[in-house]
């Protein structure tokens, strides 16, 4: 299913203006900093709970809170994006997320002077507010703006440039600082032994960068004009409601949403729990785990995003490309789970090496999924002016695991936590990974159904490509 493109990479890159490339780089930056503290830091910093002064299952609990808020705000976010300037929504998101991150930093700085319950309650509120600022006014506007920087033929390449920029920003500002903190200030004796100042400074840096990137989006990223009226009328309300109803009636869009959910576990729960398993079950050195986490989360995204997106653009179907990535990812994670049956009471170099390689390979596939997942929309009929609503539904279903799945993993983790420890056991990690693997398999089945249906459709219509429709992303 791979076809040769008419243009080489350099010629296709020239299709982008300097303004568009700059915009994609800026969008990569704001993507890093808005998502970093709520989601990605725990995938880079092993045993994040020690720095926060809480337990591992409580980290899963606060993550589930942001997931539930995401569920409540994802679809309204699509409505807002259809109605208001995406650029201004991103600016508002960056400023408010930055303010909340300042609050987080202050709590980390004073955690030894606060009770455990007081800290945990504040973290619950912080993660809940992040759910609003990183979803309602951020997620759909981000991808709508990124999509507008490229033609329909270069959609994947455009997302690849944004993803590569994301990786570079994250590598410098998230990973390298985290590496310094974990290699020098890791609280090996428990959270009470941690020096709170370095990690608090880390949070302050993220907050400051959020404010800076917010203003760069406002002044340097262009967007297509949207149809507006001077005031909200009954007619415009009915039109927007109709767009949402059309989206909700699209069965293929629902199945692709479940497919995205299956892919998302590789980016979220696998990225977190397999890293924790490396640290706490396989007893890998904390610096090694931080390096692997940073490479997977940021360096790989920068290194492979453009290449994988070029490969996806050459493929007749983005859905097929994502199916291949998912199948390989399932195989690698299954192998990781099986390695957990190797009994060890001390660090096993062979075990750590193989599991680290599997973790990296899974990360490569994950970023292939991330950068192409919204390109699926171009292979189904979504109707006119429904792009943002379609992204909203995909994200609503796809990222719902941040809510209900982390609630499940928190309970499993708590049940299998050995008395006197703050993290779960090897068996707990295996059970959590197996649950996530079943979700990935379900998503793969859903994606396969849409691909088969599309194959029958293009055969009936005598089309040469799965991407024969015009992409309406205004």
UniProtKB/Swiss-Prot annotation:
GO MF: transmembrane transporter activity
Family, as annotated: To E.coli YihN.
Database matches in Pfam families: MFS_1
Protein name: Uncharacterized protein MG294
Phylogenetic classification of the source organism: Bacteria, Bacillati, Mycoplasmatota, Mycoplasmoidales, Mycoplasmoidaceae
């Amino acid at each position: 299913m791979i076809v040769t493109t008419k243009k080489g990479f350099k010629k296709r890159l020239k299709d982008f203006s300097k303004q568009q490339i700059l915009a994609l780089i800026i969008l990569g930056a704001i993507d890093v900093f808005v998502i970093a503290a709520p989601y990605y830091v725990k995938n880079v910093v092993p045993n994040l709970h020690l720095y926060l002064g809480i337990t591992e299952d409580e980290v899963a609990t606060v993550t589930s809170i942001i997931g539930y808020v995401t569920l409540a705000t994802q679809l309204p976010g699509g409505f807002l994006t259809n109605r208001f300037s995406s650029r201004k929504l991103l600016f508002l998101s960056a400023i408010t997320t930055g303010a909340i991150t300042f609050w987080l930093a202050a709590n980390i700085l004073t955690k030894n002077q606060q009770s455990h319950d007081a800290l945990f309650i504040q973290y619950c509120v912080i993660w809940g507010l992040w759910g609003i600022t990183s979803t309602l006014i951020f997620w759909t506007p981000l991808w709508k703006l990124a999509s507008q920087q490229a033609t329909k033929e270069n959609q994947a390449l455009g997302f690849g440039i944004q993803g590569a920029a994301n990786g570079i920003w994250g590598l410098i500002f998230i990973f390298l600082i985290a590496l310094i903190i974990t290699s020098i200030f890791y609280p090996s004796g428990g959270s009470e032994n941690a020096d709170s100042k370095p990690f608090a400074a880390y949070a302050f840096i993220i907050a400051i960068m959020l404010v800076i990137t917010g203003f760069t989006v406002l002044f340097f990223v262009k967007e297509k004009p949207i149809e507006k009226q001077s005031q909200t009328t009954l007619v415009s309300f009915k039109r927007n409601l109709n767009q949402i109803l059309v989206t909700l009636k699209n069965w293929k869009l629902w199945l692709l949403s479940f497919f995205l959910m299956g892919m998302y576990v590789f980016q979220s729960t696998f990225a977190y729990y397999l890293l924790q398993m490396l640290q706490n079950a396989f007893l890998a050195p904390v610096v090694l785990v931080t390096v692997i986490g940073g490479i997977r989360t940021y360096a790989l995204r920068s290194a492979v995003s453009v290449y994988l997106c070029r490969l996806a653009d050459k493929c007749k179907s983005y859905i097929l490309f994502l199916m291949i990535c998912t199948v390989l990812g399932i195989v690698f994670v299954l192998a990781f789970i099986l390695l957990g049956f190797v009994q060890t009471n001390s660090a096993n170099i062979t075990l750590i090496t193989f599991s680290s390689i599997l973790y990296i390979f899974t990360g490569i596939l994950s970023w292939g999924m991330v950068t192409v997942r919204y390109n699926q929309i171009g292979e189904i009929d979504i109707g006119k002016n429904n792009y943002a609503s379609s992204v909203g539904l995909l994200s609503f279903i796809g990222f719902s695991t941040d809510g209900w799945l982390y609630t499940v993993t928190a309970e499993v983790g708590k049940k299998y936590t050995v008395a006197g420890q703050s993290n779960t056991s090897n068996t707990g990690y295996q059970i959590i990974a197996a649950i996530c693997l079943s979700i990935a398999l379900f998503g793969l089945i859903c994606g396969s159904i849409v691909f088969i249906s599309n194959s029958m459709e293009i055969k009936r219509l005598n089309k040469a490509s799965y991407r024969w429709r015009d992409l309406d992303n205004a």
